[in-house]
C-alpha cells in the first residue's frame, strides 16, 4: 500500500538509507558540508539566484520567508485553512508578530480579485498588508492546485500593490 497522506509518514528505502550513509558530510555551521553546499548551489543555479538556503522542514522555511518579508504589525493574506495558519503553532504571530487576514478560497485557492479586495488601505489604525501566502497543493483543500494563470494574476496584483508573494509548496 502506498500512503500519500503526508511526507512525514514515509520511510526511506534501503537505497535511500545507503545513499545517506555514504554521503560526504561536514559541519554545516561552518559551511563544511559538501552535500548541503552542493544542494544549495544547484538550487541557486536552477532559480537564477546568487545563493540558496537548505532548511530541515517546510515549517521552518515558511517561518523564515514570513519573517524576512514582513515587519512586526504587518498583515499576511492567506486562506483560512492555510498550513502557515493552522499547523505551524501560531508561528507567524509569534516569530514575526504579524496578523493573518484569513480569506475563504475555493478549496483553499485564493483569486487575484479576492486578494485585491482584501488589501488594507493606508490607515494608521490598520496593519499594513505586506505579504500574500499561497499554498500549492492545498492540504486542507484535498490537494487542490492553483491554475498557473491565476498565480500570474495574483503575482501581478502583488507587484502592483508592492506586496511580497510566498508559495508554500506543501
Question: Which residues fall in each region the model found?
Answer:
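Helix C-cap/helix->beta junction micro-motif
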Residues: 160-161
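General beta-strand structural signal in soluble alpha/beta enzymes
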Residues: 6, 31-32, 53-56, 78-79, ...
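Short beta-strands and strand-loop turn motifs
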Residues: 23, 129-138, 165-170
Amino acid at each position: 500500500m502506498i500512503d500519500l497522506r503526508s511526507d512525514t509518514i514515509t520511510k526511506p528505502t534501503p537505497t535511500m538509507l545507503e545513499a545517506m550513509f555514504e554521503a560526504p558530510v561536514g559541519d554545516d555551521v561552518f559551511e563544511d558540508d559538501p552535500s548541503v553546499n552542493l544542494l544549495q548551489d544547484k538550487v541557486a543555479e536552477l532559480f537564477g539566484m546568487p545563493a540558496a538556503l537548505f532548511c530541515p522542514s517546510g515549517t521552518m522555511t515558511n517561518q523564515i520567508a514570513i519573517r524576512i518579508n514582513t515587519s512586526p504589525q504587518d498583515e499576511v493574506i492567506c486562506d483560512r485553512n492555510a498550513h502557515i495558519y493552522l499547523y505551524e503553532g501560531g508561528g507567524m504571530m509569534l516569530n514575526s508578530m504579524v496578523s493573518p487576514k484569513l480569506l475563504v478560497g475555493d478549496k483553499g485557492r485564493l483569486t487575484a480579485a479576492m486578494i485585491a479586495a482584501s488589501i488594507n488601505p493606508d490607515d494608521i489604525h490598520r496593519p499594513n498588508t505586506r505579504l500574500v501566502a499561497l499554498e500549492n497543493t492545498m492540504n486542507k483543500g484535498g490537494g487542490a492546485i492553483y491554475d498557473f494563470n491565476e498565480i500570474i494574476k495574483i503575482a501581478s496584483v502583488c507587484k502592483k500593490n508592492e506586496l511580497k508573494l510566498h508559495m508554500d509548496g506543501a
